[in-house]
């Protein structure tokens, strides 16, 4: 073991550790981090070398965070990344510092970053909040307004999770939606992601995603936001229904096929006559 460790450079150790961390199941970052910490046995190397992995994990997972003094939680995403561990909360018009390891927000400061699209962002944010409240019992959303490659763009992010470690499962829903404000019609692009980990007497993960494309009529802010949410609702309902139907089909067919109906001999054992079988006699003589 010592010879192997001597052959592996610190850079390679950090790379392996970072990969474990970025692939941690939802709600299990701390468990994976603690395991990696024991394996690496070098806290300074882990914190300095794998810091980017902590940040990448939180942004990929749309980690929600509560900022002291503000009611709504905001999502940690690449779209809100301002650099130097600071992130944007467009709804509350602030930026804040985020500790990727402790998952805590601090130092809120005023920040205007809607790219001159305040009314568009607020209309979409208001409509999306109502949708998330109706459809996700533990859901959060953040809406950004940016100018990307010269195009005014709305980006909507949704996160909802259920962490049930006592029941040996954790799961998270994420979706991201974009459209450019280009009348009369704009393309809507979305990606939906589901990740669930079940680990009682086994280790099963569901990792699924779906890409969506649609179009929305761009008129005034309120009407466009309403049509935007209709597209989101239809696509997400359709995806969730398809996932449920697929699991029902798997339960009725695939999983049943995994269970052996008869022993290898293709003959059922008559337990009332077990003593007449050779194995029964051998057991009796044992």
Swiss-Prot record:
Keyword 4Fe-4S: no
One Pfam family from the record: F-actin_cap_A
Gene Ontology terms describing biological process: actin cytoskeleton organization; barbed-end actin filament capping; cell junction assembly
Keyword Phosphoprotein (UniProt): yes
Biological role stated in the UniProt entry: F-actin-capping proteins bind in a Ca(2+)-independent manner to the fast growing ends of actin filaments (barbed end) thereby blocking the exchange of subunits at these ends. Unlike other capping proteins (such as gelsolin and severin), these proteins do not sever actin filaments. May play a role in the formation of epithelial cell junctions. Forms, with CAPZB, the barbed end of the fast growing ends of actin filaments in the dynactin complex and stabilizes dynactin structure.
Residues recorded as bearing N6-acetyllysine in the entry: 19, 97
Alphabetized UniProt keyword annotations: Acetylation, Actin capping, Actin-binding, Cytoplasm, Cytoskeleton, Phosphoprotein
Residues annotated with Phosphoserine modification: 9
Compartments, as annotated in UniProt: Cytoplasm, Cytoskeleton
Protein name stated in the entry: F-actin-capping protein subunit alpha-1
Protein family: Belongs to the F-actin-capping protein alpha subunit family.
Gene Ontology cellular component list: cortical cytoskeleton; F-actin capping protein complex; WASH complex
PROSITE patterns per UniProt: F_ACTIN_CAPPING_A_1, F_ACTIN_CAPPING_A_2
Modification N-acetylalanine, positions: 2
